[in-house]
Amino acid sequence: MKIPKRIQPLVDDGLVDEVIRRLKSGKEADVYVVRCGQDIRCAKVYKEAENRNFKQAVQYQEGRKVRNSRDARAMAKGSKFGRKQQEETWQTAEVDALYLLANAGVRVPQPYACLDGVLLMELVTDEDGLAAPRLSDVPFSKEQALIDHAAMIRYVVRMLCAGLVHGDLSEFNVLIDKDGPVITDLPQAVNAAANNHAKAMLERDVANMTHYYGQYAPELLGTKYAKEMWALYEDGKLHPETSLTGEFAESTQAADVEGVLEEIQAVIAEEQERLREAQDPY
């Protein structure tokens, strides 16, 4: 097929020899099957911000570290340079996440290069060497659903231990090869410790997985893996090989509203006293 304009620089640099076909078009990127020498890989072409259909991207970028202070200031101001840097940060976030998670024992595609908004990475394949199907396209027996769901929960735990939450995990960005699930699409992955939305995103990720596999194994629908793992994470007790039960006892203790109000009043009183002393040092 005709070489897409965005992939041409990779061809010019000898990274890609042939574009075979478009594999999929998503809300944040188009993916092509490409030939690199004797290897068949895929090229993920990120869409520009104005063409992406990724809602509330700002929530996902909260807590991300920007190494260069000049870049951080430009991004905060929203200048043309800042928007360009914001785009590069969005794209490189996926590369960083892929390397981090692979080292953490999470099954993800292997990245090879990222150039001008194009990520060259492993093409995940099935037993016949064809592009692996998405989870949404694979039927399961009850037994296999339980096995794969357990694998996904294990990967989510390892991600959290590595400091990341996927943030957009669903049956549409998990591939199934001969060895089980492979997690994809990570540009929006969030910093678990620095993003105020991380807990809610984790719960949504796990709920999506549980709902899908629960179609085949209904007993999964009553599990509370997200709440269990987050509680352990907050207490510093979550480890990559932590064995979860899927059970979580919600706190039944009533909130001490009166006590909280007393603390607030005490803080206000202290601040008022401090201001009085500042105005009248004698």
Please provide the spans of the model-predicted regions:
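A glycine-rich phosphate-binding loop feature that marks nucleotide/adenosyl-phosphate handling sites
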Residues: 117, 173-176, 226-232
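A local structural micro-motif
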Residues: 18-19, 109, 167, 177, ...
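Catalytic activation segment of kinase domains across protein kinase-like and atypical kinase folds
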Residues: 37-48, 128-138, 142, 170-215
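Catalytic-loop of the protein kinase fold
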Residues: 161-171
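Regulatory N- and C-terminal appendages and interdomain linkers associated
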Residues: 1-25, 143, 147, 151, ...
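Flexible, glycine- and charge-enriched loops at secondary-structure boundaries
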Residues: 84-87, 91, 142-149, 195, ...
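Conserved ATP-binding subdomain of kinase catalytic cores across diverse folds
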Residues: 1-131, 157, 161
